[in-house]
């Protein structure tokens, strides 16, 4: 079941995070989860201040994490609020498989999700602004990847963009004009 898949994923992630924390602690690394400011460099290394506490170290690793890009298109805010539009974080935690999934973006995340959700039964459409998938990937590799995903049932709208998100899908601007694509979920990737 999808619920078991999500539960297993969460357990694996927790175990990995715990392992990384233990390795960092064992190596004498101080981890600060807060906003910080690099003040200067001195004879001992880098001087950093966070929440009125100073740190001095020979090495500094800044791990900011990431957040999903939310495109500025009509209807996106309402779609996020209603749960129609989701980011990759929500997609990794869905316990119900959407019957139809529209994926905005044919990059790494979008293609991974297209592969997974098509293999568990979703009808998947990927909308990509470029004329090929997988961004800067070699064109031959991109074509082979697209063909493999199409064999799994994934549909592509290349050289296209989502113009508007509606209550039950999206209006997509393609080379042949506008097309309305119905979707249970829209992944912003």
Q: What are these model-derived regions, one by one?
A:
Residues 6, 12-17, 21, 92-93, ...:
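Rossmann-like dinucleotide-binding cores of NAD(P)H-dependent redox enzymes
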Residues 14-104, 171-189:
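FAD-binding core/adjacent interface of flavoenzyme oxidoreductases
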């Amino acid at each position: 079941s999808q619920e078991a898949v999500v539960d297993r994923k969460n357990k694996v992630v927790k175990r990995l995070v715990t392992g990384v924390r233990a390795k960092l602690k064992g190596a004498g690394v101080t981890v600060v989860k807060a906003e910080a400011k690099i003040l200067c460099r001195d004879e001992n290394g880098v001087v950093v201040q966070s929440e009125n506490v100073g740190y001095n170290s020979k090495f500094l690793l800044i791990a900011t994490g990431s957040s999903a890009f939310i495109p500025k298109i009509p209807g996106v805010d309402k779609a996020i609020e209603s749960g129609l539009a989701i980011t990759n974080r929500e997609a990794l935690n869905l316990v119900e498989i959407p019957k139809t999934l529209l994926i905005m973006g044919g990059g790494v995340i979008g293609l991974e999700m297209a592969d997974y959700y098509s293999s568990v039964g979703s009808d998947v459409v990927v909308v990509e602004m470029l004329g090929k998938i997988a961004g800067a990937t070699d064109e031959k590799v991109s074509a082979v990847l697209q063909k493999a995903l199409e064999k799994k049932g994934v549909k592509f709208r290349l050289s296209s963009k989502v113009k508007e998100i509606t209550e039950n899908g999206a209006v997509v601007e393609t080379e042949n004009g506008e097309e309305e694509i119905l979707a249970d979920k829209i992944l912003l990737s």
